[in-house]
């Protein structure tokens, strides 16, 4: 008798991702002559980020099951945000569960959560910084994240509410981070599948009270917004939003390529952006070039919003002699003699 359908589903999702990782990190010894001695590198290490919740515990269990069969080392990391009383003890419990699954290395990392961008964004920034550092420290080639299709739907709605562009509507990528470090195997699986997999394997899970706290935007969306949409529109809203994310990502990727190819054609010999040539481009392509130029000048990508780029765009499409535009990171955009100059102020 095979595993529970939910367990089979999570294992298959992880197996596919691990196969991709193996292909990407295969040792380059195949081209060496057989009579030339050479040392093979150690098997790749894949870490799972685990909060102890159902999604990440299911992911950890699937990684622990699949990795040895593929000759991959598997470890686990939990991040203690220190936002709740006893969080350090819970983090230690999670590490114990990861050890019980057979994962090694395992580690609990305590972080200090700042205030920039609100509590959710600050916690996310601290968490990813800790995971990046852990991956470098342990020499991991990838870190698995337990985001599900439900998380993807929530992300799309949050982007829509902010009035963001198509890139925000594309949600979370299956592969992201420097060098493709972060992998999200569960983006095609719903949250209930992960929870059922934990139940079928008798895995203890921890339900973070913050996930039910209406003080947090994502929590309100999860417990009030999405149920209201499904009540008004019928079942299938989550699936439709996740599908929208993928279609939007395909379009956004194509526009990014177009913008990258067009950028060289709108710069003069000195590398400055020519306003007349920018004006001739489609708005979606032009704004991507402007955003890229602002980031290259030092504007933090996470603080550079659509409204900032729209203001810079008006220097090209609605020129009336207006002054310089101040952007995040002390970057200034200014039109000078038919050229657009974006630089540190």
UniProtKB/Swiss-Prot annotation:
It is an enzyme of class 6 (ligase). The keyword Nucleotide-binding applies. ATP binds at residues 51-56. Keywords: ATP-binding, Cytoplasm, Ligase, Nucleotide-binding, tRNA processing. It catalyses: cytidine(34) in tRNA(Ile2) + L-lysine + ATP = lysidine(34) in tRNA(Ile2) + AMP + diphosphate + H(+). The keyword Metal-binding does not apply. One of its GO terms (molecular function) is ATP binding. CDD domains: TilS_N. One of its GO terms (cellular component) is cytoplasm. InterPro entries: Rossmann-like_a/b/a_fold, TilS/TtcA_N, tRNA_Ile_lys_synt, tRNA_Ile_lys_synt_N, tRNA_Ile_lys_synt_subst-bd. It is found in: Cytoplasm. Signal peptide: none annotated. GO terms for biological process: tRNA modification. Its EC number is 6.3.4.19. PANTHER family: TRNA(ILE)-LYSIDINE SYNTHASE-RELATED. Belongs to the tRNA(Ile)-lysidine synthase family. Ligates lysine onto the cytidine present at position 34 of the AUA codon-specific tRNA(Ile) that contains the anticodon CAU, in an ATP-dependent manner. Cytidine is converted to lysidine, thus changing the amino acid specificity of the tRNA from methionine to isoleucine. HAMAP family: tRNA_Ile_lys_synt. The N-terminal region contains the highly conserved SGGXDS motif, predicted to be a P-loop motif involved in ATP binding. This is tRNA(Ile)-lysidine synthase. It comes from Streptomyces avermitilis (strain ATCC 31267 / DSM 46492 / JCM 5070 / NBRC 14893 / NCIMB 12804 / NRRL 8165 / MA-4680). The gene is tilS.
């Amino acid at each position: 008798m095979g595993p529970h359908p939910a367990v089979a589903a999570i294992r298959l999702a992880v197996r596919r991702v691990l196969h991709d990782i193996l292909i990407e990190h295969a040792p380059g010894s195949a081209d060496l002559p057989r009579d030339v001695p050479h040392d093979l590198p150690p098997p790749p290490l894949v870490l799972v980020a685990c909060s102890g919740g159902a999604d990440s515990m299911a992911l950890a269990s699937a990684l622990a099951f699949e990795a040895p069969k593929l000759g991959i080392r598997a470890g686990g990391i939990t991040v203690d945000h220190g936002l709740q009383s006893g969080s350090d003890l819970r983090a230690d419990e999670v590490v114990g569960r990861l050890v019980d699954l057979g994962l090694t290395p395992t580690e609990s990392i305590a972080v200090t959560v700042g205030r920039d961008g609100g509590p959710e964004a600050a916690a996310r920034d601290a968490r990813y910084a800790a995971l990046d550092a852990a991956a470098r420290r342990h020499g991991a080639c990838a870190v698995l994240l337990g985001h599900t299709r439900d998380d993807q739907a929530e992300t799309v709605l949050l982007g829509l509410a902010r009035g963001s562009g198509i890139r925000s509507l594309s949600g979370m990528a299956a592969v992201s981070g420097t060098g493709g470090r972060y992998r999200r195997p569960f983006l095609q699986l719903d949250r209930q599948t992960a929870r059922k997999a934990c139940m079928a394997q008798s895995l203890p899970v921890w339900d973070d009270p913050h996930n039910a706290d209406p003080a947090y935007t994502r929590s309100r969306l999860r417990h009030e917004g999405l149920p209201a949409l499904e009540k008004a529109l019928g079942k299938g809203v989550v699936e439709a939003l996740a599908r929208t994310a993928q279609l939007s990502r395909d379009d956004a990727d194509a526009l990014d390529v177009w913008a990258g190819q067009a950028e060289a054609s709108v710069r003069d010999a000195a590398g400055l952006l020519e306003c007349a040539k920018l004006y001739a481009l489609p708005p979606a392509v032009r704004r991507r070039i402007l955003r890229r130029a602002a980031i290259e000048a030092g504007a933090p990508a996470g603080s550079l919003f659509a409204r900032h780029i729209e203001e810079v765009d008006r220097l090209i499409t609605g020129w009336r002699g207006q002054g310089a535009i101040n952007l995040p990171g002390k970057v200034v955009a200014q039109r000078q003699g038919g050229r657009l100059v974006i630089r540190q102020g």
